[in-house]
Swiss-Prot record:
Similarity field: Belongs to the three-finger toxin family. Long-chain subfamily. Type II alpha-neurotoxin sub-subfamily.
CDD domains: TFP_snake_toxin
Domain of life where this protein originates: Eukaryota
Organism taxonomic ancestry: Eukaryota, Metazoa, Chordata, Craniata, Vertebrata
Purpose: Binds with high affinity to muscular nicotinic acetylcholine receptors (nAChRs), whereas it binds with a low affinity to neuronal alpha-7/CHRNA7 nAChRs.
Protein name stated in the entry: Long neurotoxin-like OH-31
Amino acid sequence: MKTLLLTLVVVTILCLDLGLELTNAPDSWSSRRTCLCPAWVPLRSRPVAGHSKQCGSRGRRVDLGCAATCPIVKPGVNINCCSTDNCNPFPKRS
């Protein structure tokens, strides 16, 4: 019985796609970053733009990545959460 149960678990893992994949970089980037998270986690892809001392002369700092939930917004930080591919393009310079 244990062998049958173990076999079913292995087959399920191999046959089902247990990950949700979002691409987090626009096509123009030379390397695309991809987040793989379990399908049961509500995945959010979020760019976070804010000013920092190191990057003040270069414009806004933008972080693209995955999070299980949309983070709490802090003053001076712009957060955009989404759950589809390429929904958070890198902002264009103005």
